[in-house]
Amino acid sequence: MERSLSSHYRDPGVDNWSNHNIKYVKLALYEGRREVAYVVSNAVGSSMTDWFQSTRVIASSWSDVTARGTYNVFSITGYLSHLRRFYINKSHGGCPKDRGYMAVSDSKVQGCQWDSHPIYPQFLYSKINSADNWERFMFGRADFLAIFVYI
């Protein structure tokens, strides 16, 4: 699949999140038609922004992304100064020591080397079964991100 859309698709039902009795939400990253990474969250009692937090994780493609895991960032908002959304990061320690699982890079910023990409957005993910050092540039680049809601 190519990145041919000029905008993102967002179902209008998201605006009525609290009226839908949502049980689970799955965020998945795809390369072509192949799912390459995912996080499933318990969404009972959640809002459209707080379903994506570490304490709600019930399943993940990374073995160490769990509700009991330790992260310095795990949120939709992410790391604002570097425009990293849907960011799951294990540890910051200056660019050469940053280790994480996934990030959506919105646009070019003066951040780390791994924040610079040829096109935006970028859907980045660790290709190993745990957090990876972002500066190794071994992360995968998904073609798209999808969010599935289970009622």
Regions flagged by a language model, labelled:
Residues 1-151:
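Mature extracellular or lumenal effector domains of secreted proteins
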